[in-house]
């Protein structure tokens, strides 16, 4: 049987992904710049049309389980100086950001296919997260804060109280988690970005439990600032 154009494009994508794992010393190589404009989109300067093109690509290339309840994407993940392939993760810095994008796109377009794909990806992540395959890093973009954001976003969009309870459970985990003295405090990978995220949610929730969590994390931030004479 002949491959359809869509199937052929998927096969080419998988080949490119596979070849990317052969590269080494990623940070030491730099391509010479070329004065060529690459047209990635056909939607002109319309941000929404271009976003729809990205969303359709993500929906088309999502890999679903047999029951169509969970999905993921083959992800390029940085592993030291090399690239490795794996399932998509929950961090906003990587595929959690993809999920957040799809949720927002569903709001802007009213198309449920984007939200359903985002939810399928969340369910895959939850299953592995429950099996302790993910670290609970104290970070908004590269840790537990990413899941907090995604759960809260789903709750605000769909008013699904189950996701509010999941969000609250993670807040409770933060309340009791032991913060290591050598914890990362920068905005992307550490405590400061997480505190900002929680403060933004507090603006809407006015929740005492959340406030206590913010105070706990902020005290640690102040301790680290004192250590650095900031």
Which sequence ranges carry the predicted segments?
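Short, conserved phosphate-binding/catalytic loop or strand-edge motifs used
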Residues: 143-147, 168-175, 189-194
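Solvent-exposed loop and edge beta-strand segments that line ligand/cofactor-binding
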Residues: 78-95, 127-144, 179-191, 230
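Solenoidal tandem-repeat scaffolds enriched in leucines and small polar residues
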Residues: 185-230
């Amino acid at each position: 049987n002949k491959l359809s154009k869509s199937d052929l494009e998927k096969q080419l994508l998988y080949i490119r992904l596979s070849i990317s794992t052969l590269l080494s010393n990623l940070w030491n190589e730099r391509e010479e710049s070329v004065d060529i404009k690459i047209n990635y989109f056909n939607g002109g300067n319309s941000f929404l049309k271009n976003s729809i093109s990205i969303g359709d690509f993500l929906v088309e290339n999502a890999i679903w389980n047999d029951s169509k309840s969970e999905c993921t994407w083959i992800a390029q993940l940085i592993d030291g100086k090399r690239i490795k392939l794996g399932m998509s993760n929950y961090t906003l810095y990587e595929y959690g950001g993809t999920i957040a994008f799809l949720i927002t796109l569903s709001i802007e377009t009213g198309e449920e296919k984007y939200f359903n794909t985002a939810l399928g990806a969340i369910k895959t992540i939850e299953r592995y997260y429950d099996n302790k395959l993910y670290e609970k890093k104290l970070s908004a973009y590269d840790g537990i804060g990413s899941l907090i954001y995604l759960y809260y976003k789903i709750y605000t969009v769909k008013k699904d109280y189950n996701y509010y309870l999941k969000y609250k459970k993670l807040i409770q985990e933060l309340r009791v988690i032991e913060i290591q003295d050598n914890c990362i405090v920068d905005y992307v990978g550490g405590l400061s970005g997480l505190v900002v995220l929680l403060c933004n949610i507090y603006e809407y929730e006015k929740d005492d439990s959340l406030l206590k969590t913010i105070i706990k994390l902020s005290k640690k931030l102040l301790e680290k600032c004192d250590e650095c004479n900031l």
